[in-house]
Structure formats: structure tokens, C-alpha cells
């Protein structure tokens, strides 16, 4: 009897002692494992890696401008990263303990900013994340600041930039001929590394290097301009890539990628276009599904997604665009074939989101298999990247010489008729595509 009373008394004493301890013993704090900052020309993204979903509050402060993120019952593990001096929005990042148990992260801002914040669930690459997107309240001032920062010789040398700011200038109206605009899209970026080779080569780095080389070659052609959809290591949502190409009134959209497969012996290049029906193969269907997951990996606020195609009538315009996409893709595939081994000898088709522009012929080029050790090594090689850029340019030039957009320098020379081109396309275009394309004009 007395032993039971003593045991109960001891348990009550232990419980009372635990209740007297600080709150962090009673309830474990959520760990913030670290942060990443992605600096894009028109926005800055700060990502906090959190161990679990967490109550948080985001609010701005003035004089000087700051952004505060308060996280309830949280602690920071490690240090916060430094901020690139070229960032037009954020000048510093710091943290401190608040009210004993909470974590406060403060972002020192260079100017007032629009703020969006949202949490992301875990995926194959990352765990739980808290994302804060900042964009300038005055976009014009931000663009000027970004242009000034990019003009620094040190930064230009570091980025390997060779393009002139004039390459994005608006074409004059009137009787003058306009330039052909090619949107060059480096796949993945920022939070989304894409495929990763056995030696650690990241697809997002390889695609950006090739895209820059291709853009530089396009800009050197008379009557042509390139628009880089991504010109740094930051995330661009798939539909935003389409929107940027359409904003610049591109005549062609080329998305550059590096393929991956479980079998490391698989190798070679492939070229894909949008399908208005089913995929041409299970492999094409699988690849499209993988690439379309980029938004989930890179981080898109699903509550705010707005389909750029929702208000556009796609019927005949989309069909004509797909036809021209296939023709342009065959020209590029032919040049890649002359460079070396191709994985798919015919154009493949599937439902790639990034190719769904209703009025811009679009293609996705898998330059090589980054999962193949030999091809991974070649993809890292600057000389091979140059060869790929040359092949892509050659195919693009062949297409525009045959189908010159009205009002451009290319339109002065002779062009092939759709009927003459159809026979040449039969050997390269996969099932489901038409033979004779309709001519496309900008604005169709």
C-alpha cells in the first residue's frame, strides 16, 4: 500500500518538474535547416527549408525597407546565406530569437517590394519549404538597376555574357524589316536542378551554358535576335516561359534539355514537339510527364496559377503551330544527326506544357543523356557545347530560310512551298503530324 502511494507521489513530482521546464522541452521546436536565395531579373525568391509545416507571419517594415518573417516555435540550424550584390531587391539576410521560442528572419531590402509567400509539400528533391517571392513595386526602376548591375565588366566576365542590351529592343514600325526573334529556353533552374549525372553534373547548368552559346550565335546573324528565357540560376514556371516568349513576339521557341534514364548505356539526342493527340511513344509520354513536374519541384503557388492559354482560341492556330513546330524540329534533328548519334531518328510528340504556345512554333531538344557517363562528360565540355549550339543554329536557319516570317530579312529570298517540304519531312516526323503546313505570320 505505502509503496504504491510512494510511486504515485514520485510520478506526480516528475510531472510537476516537467511542467516547470521551458516550453521547448514540452514541445520540440521546428527546425529551419537553412535558406536559399535565387536572384532573377524581375524577382527574388527566398526559400526556407523547414522540417515540417509551421505557423508563420510575413510583413513589411519601412524606414528602411525590410521584410520580416516570424516563425512560431522554430530554431535555425546553421547560418543564413549571403546575398549577391547584384540582387536588385535584397541587400541582406539576418535572423534572431524572438520571445524565447520563435525565430525571426529579416530581409533588408533595397526598395519597396510586393510580397507573396506560400508553403510547398515535399517532393523527390526537397522536403517542406516556405517560399517568399519578392518583386519590385516599381518594375521600371528595377529593370534599370538590373541593367546597370549586369553592365559591370566583372559580372559580365563572370557570367560569360556576350549579348548586347539592344538585342531586346522593340523593333521600329513602318517599312523597315523586323528581326526574326528566337526564344531560347534553358530548361529547369533555381530550385529545380533537372536531371543529375553520376559525376554530379546538373542539367540546369548544362542547359544554361548551351542556351547562352546558342543565343550569342543567333545575335550574330543579320536580321535575327535571341531572347533568353532564363539567363541565370533561377526558377521560371513553365507557363511563364511561354508568356515571356509571347511577350517578345518570338517566331520560334527552342527549349534545351539533357535527358536521363535508368539505363546508363542509353545515349543520343532527341527532338520533341507538342502533340495534338496522344504521345508517339511511351518514352515520349514518360518524358513529358517528368518535364511537366518542373513546376512542382521548382515551386509554383498552385492557388495563383493562371493558364495563359485559357482565353485563347486554339483550334486552327494551334494546329498550324504544331505543323510548323514539326518542320522546324526536323531541320534541327537533321543537324544533330550530322553531329553524332541520335536516340530517336524521328520527331517525337507528347503533351509538354512548355510547348503549348498557341501561336509560336516550339520544340524541346534533349541534347544528350546526362545519365550516360560518356555523354555527361561531353556535356560539360565547352567545345562540345559549341558544336551543339552550331547544330541547333544550323537547323533554325534552315527552317527560316524555307519559311521566312513576313516582314523579315529572310522573306526577301525564295522560300520553299509547303508541298515541296512535306516529302522531306515524312522520314523525320513521327505519327500524328500533318504533311503540308500553313504559313504562319506574327500575330496569327
Name the predicted role of every residue range.
Residues 2, 25-182, 428-431, 436-444:
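Signal-peptide-cleaved, periplasmic/extracellular N-terminal interaction regions immediately downstream
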Residues 69, 262, 313-414, 429, ...:
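Active-site-adjacent mobile loop/cap segments within catalytic or ligand-binding domains
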Amino acid at each position: 500500500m505505502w509503496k504504491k502511494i510512494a510511486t504515485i507521489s514520485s510520478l506526480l513530482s516528475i510531472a510537476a518538474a516537467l511542467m516547470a521546464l521551458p516550453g521547448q522541452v514540452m514541445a520540440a521546436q521546428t527546425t529551419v535547416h537553412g535558406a536559399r536565395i535565387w536572384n532573377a531579373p524581375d524577382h527574388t525568391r527566398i526559400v526556407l527549408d523547414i522540417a515540417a509545416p509551421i505557423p508563420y507571419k510575413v510583413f513589411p517594415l519601412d524606414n528602411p525597407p525590410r521584410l520580416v518573417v516570424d516563425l512560431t516555435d522554430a530554431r535555425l540550424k546553421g547560418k543564413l546565406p549571403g546575398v549577391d550584390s547584384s540582387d536588385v531587391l535584397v541587400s541582406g539576410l539576418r535572423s534572431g530569437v524572438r520571445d524565447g521560442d520563435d525565430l525571426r528572419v529579416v530581409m533588408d531590402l533595397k526598395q519597396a517590394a510586393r510580397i507573396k509567400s506560400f508553403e510547398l509539400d515535399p517532393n523527390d528533391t526537397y522536403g517542406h519549404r516556405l517560399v517568399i517571392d519578392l518583386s519590385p513595386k516599381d518594375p521600371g526602376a528595377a529593370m534599370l538597376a538590373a541593367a546597370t548591375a549586369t553592365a559591370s565588366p566583372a559580372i559580365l566576365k563572370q557570367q560569360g555574357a556576350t549579348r548586347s542590351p539592344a538585342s531586346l529592343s522593340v523593333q521600329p514600325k513602318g517599312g523597315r524589316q523586323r528581326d526574326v526573334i528566337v526564344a531560347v529556353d534553358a530548361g529547369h533552374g533555381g530550385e529545380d536542378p533537372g536531371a543529375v549525372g553520376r559525376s554530379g553534373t546538373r542539367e540546369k547548368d548544362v542547359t544554361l551554358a548551351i542556351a547562352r552559346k546558342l543565343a550569342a550565335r543567333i545575335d550574330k546573324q543579320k536580321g535575327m535576335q535571341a531572347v533568353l528565357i532564363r539567363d541565370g540560376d533561377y526558377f521560371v514556371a513553365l507557363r511563364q516561359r511561354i508568356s515571356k516568349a509571347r511577350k517578345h513576339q518570338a517566331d520560334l521557341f527552342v527549349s534545351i534539355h539533357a535527358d536521363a534514364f535508368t539505363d546508363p548505356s542509353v545515349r543520343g539526342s532527341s527532338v520533341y514537339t507538342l502533340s495534338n493527340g496522344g504521345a508517339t511513344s511511351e518514352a515520349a509520354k514518360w518524358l513529358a510527364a517528368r518535364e511537366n513536374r518542373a513546376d512542382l519541384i521548382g515551386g509554383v503557388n498552385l492557388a495563383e496559377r493562371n493558364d495563359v492559354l485559357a482565353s485563347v482560341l486554339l483550334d486552327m492556330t494551334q494546329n498550324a503551330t504544331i505543323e510548323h513546330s514539326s518542320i522546324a524540329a526536323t531541320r534541327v534533328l537533321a543537324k544533330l544527326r550530322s553531329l553524332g548519334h541520335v536516340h530517336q531518328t524521328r520527331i517525337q510528340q507528347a503533351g509538354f506544357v512548355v510547348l503549348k504556345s498557341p501561336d509560336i512554333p516550339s520544340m524541346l531538344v534533349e541534347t544528350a543523356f546526362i545519365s550516360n557517363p560518356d555523354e555527361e562528360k561531353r556535356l560539360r565540355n565547352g567545345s562540345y557545347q559549341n558544336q551543339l549550339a552550331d547544330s541547333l543554329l544550323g537547323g533554325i536557319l534552315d527552317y527560316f530560310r524555307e519559311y521566312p516570317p513576313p516582314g523579315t530579312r529572310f522573306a526577301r529570298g525564295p522560300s520553299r512551298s509547303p508541298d515541296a517540304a512535306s516529302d522531306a519531312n515524312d522520314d523525320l516526323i513521327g505519327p500524328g503530324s500533318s504533311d503540308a503546313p500553313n504559313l504562319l505570320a506574327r500575330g496569327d
